[in-house]
Swiss-Prot record:
Its EC number is 1.5.1.5, 3.5.4.9. NADP(+) binds at G166, R167, S168, S195, T236. The keyword Oxidoreductase applies. Homodimer. PROSITE patterns: THF_DHG_CYH_2. This is Bifunctional protein FolD. It comes from Dehalococcoides mccartyi (strain CBDB1). CDD domains: NAD_bind_m-THF_DH_Cyclohyd. The keyword Lipid metabolism does not apply. InterPro entries: Aminoacid_DH-like_N_sf (IPR046346), NAD(P)-bd_dom_sf (IPR036291), THF_DH/CycHdrlase (IPR000672), THF_DH/CycHdrlase_cat_dom (IPR020630), THF_DH/CycHdrlase_CS (IPR020867), THF_DH/CycHdrlase_NAD-bd_dom (IPR020631). SUPFAM superfamilies: Aminoacid dehydrogenase-like, N-terminal domain (SSF53223), NAD(P)-binding Rossmann-fold domains (SSF51735).
Length: 296
């Protein structure tokens, strides 16, 4: 029997309507409009596409947006000056600097310059520390999206063994921290695997919930998955193009093989991807509410 397909597009659409209602209410009752500033350095097509999708989503939800493009040869000082301006701008609730950045730019220097209260990507050390301590913070968008996918799909997380394959600062590490918290929608036993892990299939087969987040197309095969497990595929690698020039994406899981063994599985596309951008919008809304003391 094939697995239940967890449709991230449908779940993200439901959250989108919740956010739209809150944005409208915030405008009507308090005269507050959440605002997101995006910063893009250079002309990378993929980065342009990602930023465009975020701007369109802001427009769709009634969130104010500003886009600040900078040339490929921009300096650290250029970015720091812009970020200081955005930090001080009351119209801007959240700031997103699209990564990766050109080689001459210090990513850590730039991201750490963002006011933690406007760090809607959840990358600032202050927010990372708060996340680890279980304090109110901005959660990184993709890991938070994974958690919401599980919760809204009715999948129990508490008391389960979650195995995460991948230890990146963007997904693996923060997701582990989120899911091990003593909190609703978490409280799992978490194992992180990586390139140095021995006997990887033995460990992945122990997972009640298996998360693949290493960026290796179809790396997770059926023999690595326990019968009845929940499989979340975070991978999105471009493996080619259609004759029309559209990107062909592959996840980290061999979907066709694994879906015959898993209880539930996310596809690529239409799985985790749509959740990432909607969590960014949720963080932007949260930032606007915190800025005026509506929430902590």
């Amino acid at each position: 029997m094939s697995a239940h397909i967890i449709n991230g597009t449908e779940i993200a659409a439901a959250i989108r309507e919740e956010i739209r209602s809150e944005v409208t209410a915030l405008k009507t009752k308090a005269g507050i409009v959440p605002g997101l500033a995006t910063v893009l350095v250079g002309d990378d097509p993929a980065s342009h596409s990602y930023v465009d999708s975020k701007i369109k989503m802001c427009q769709n939800l009634g969130i104010y947006s500003e886009h600040h493009p900078l040339p490929q040869n921009a300096t650290n000082e250029d970015l720091l000056t812009l970020i200081a301006k955005l930090n001080a701008d009351p119209k801007i609730s959240g700031i997103l600097v699209q990564v990766p950045l050109p080689a001459q730019i210090s990513e850590s220097l730039v991201l750490n310059a963002i006011n933690p209260d406007k760090d809607v990507d959840g990358f600032h050390p202050v927010n990372v520390g708060r996340m680890c301590l279980g304090e109110p913070c901005f959660l990184p968008c993709t890991p938070h999206g994974v958690q919401e996918l599980l919760i809204r799909s009715g999948i129990k997380i508490e008391g389960t063994h979650v195995v995460i394959v991948g230890r990146s600062n963007l997904v693996g590490k923060p997701l582990a921290n989120i899911l091990l918290q003593k909190a609703p929608g978490a409280n799992a036993t978490v194992t992180i695997c990586h390139s140095g892990t021995k006997n990887l299939p033995e460990i992945t087969r122990q997972a009640d919930i298996l998360v693949a987040a290493m960026g290796k197309p179809k790396f997770i095969t059926a023999d690595m998955v326990r019968e009845g497990a929940v499989v979340i595929d975070v991978g999105t690698t471009c493996i080619g193009y259609t004759p029309e020039g559209k990107r062909i994406l592959s996840g980290d899981v061999d979907f066709e093989e694994v879906k015959e063994k898993a209880f539930a599985i996310t596809p690529v596309p239409k799985g985790v991807g749509p959740m990432t951008i909607i969590m960014l919008m949720l963080n932007t809304l949260t930032a606007a509410k915190r800025a005026v003391g509506l929430i902590k």
